[in-house]
């Protein structure tokens, strides 16, 4: 008939070979997503996308859907200082540290309809004070692009004390380096669809 119907879109439609299905409850449509509590330097976290619903009808069969990122991208330029140019420094771990537990992990329902900030919101995540990234990356003295990137959930509130603790192998001996807290009068609040970049220099 001529009745218009809402068309929803999300990505991916399956995870580890299992279909991701839409659930409906009291007019709210959502899909279940998982945000990892730890990841690798290669990045195993799935990039979840959603679209603003669009109406289709008998007289309006051609529609266009624009997808948006539900997660936040965080990238690092991690390099060694010139006075360590003769030594082999291998990055082994990045510990993203949130003093008041503003990092978000776990299973959530990604909302596919709603108004304003309701759309694309991840409901049901748990707060945590740490997310670890692990791998092996030999550090250079200069970089033209980030050498580590990850996807994390948006923060539900601002973090006043955000820092990074790095584990670095220095000529066979593991050492820890911790950055100062990222200073901002209003704190740090990672938002969905945004890309945050941090530069960290390792000195010996």
Show the residue positions of the predicted features:
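Short, low-hydrophobicity acidic/polar segments
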Residues: 1-90, 95, 132-148, 160-170, ...
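Short, ordered, surface-exposed loop/turn motifs in non-cytosolic proteins
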Residues: 84-125
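Short, surface-exposed linear segments at secondary-structure transitions and domain or protein termini
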Residues: 115-121, 184-198
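Active-site/ligand-binding surface loops and adjacent short beta/alpha elements
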Residues: 116-142
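Edge beta-strands of extracellular beta-sandwich domains
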Residues: 174-183
């Amino acid at each position: 008939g001529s009745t218009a119907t809402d068309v929803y879109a999300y990505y991916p439609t399956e995870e580890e070979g299992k279909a991701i299905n839409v659930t409906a409850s009291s007019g709210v449509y959502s899909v279940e997503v998982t945000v990892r509590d730890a990841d690798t330097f290669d990045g195993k976290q799935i990039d979840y996308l959603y679209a603003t619903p669009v109406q289709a009808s008998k007289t309006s069969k051609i529609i266009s859907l624009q997808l948006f990122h539900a997660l936040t991208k965080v990238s690092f330029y991690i390099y060694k200082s010139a006075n360590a140019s003769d030594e082999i420094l291998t990055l082994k771990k990045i510990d993203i540290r949130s003093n008041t537990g503003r990092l978000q992990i776990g299973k959530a329902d990604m909302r596919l309809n709603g108004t304003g900030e309701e759309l694309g919101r991840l409901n049901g995540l748990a707060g945590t004070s740490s997310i670890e990234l692990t791998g092996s990356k030999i550090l250079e003295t200069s970089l033209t692009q980030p050498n580590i990137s990850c996807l994390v959930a948006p923060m539900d509130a601002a973090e006043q004390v955000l820092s990074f603790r790095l584990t670095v192998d220095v000529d066979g001996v593991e050492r820890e380096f911790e950055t100062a807290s990222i200073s901002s009068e209003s704190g740090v609040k990672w938002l969905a669809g945004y890309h945050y970049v941090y530069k960290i220099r390792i000195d010996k």
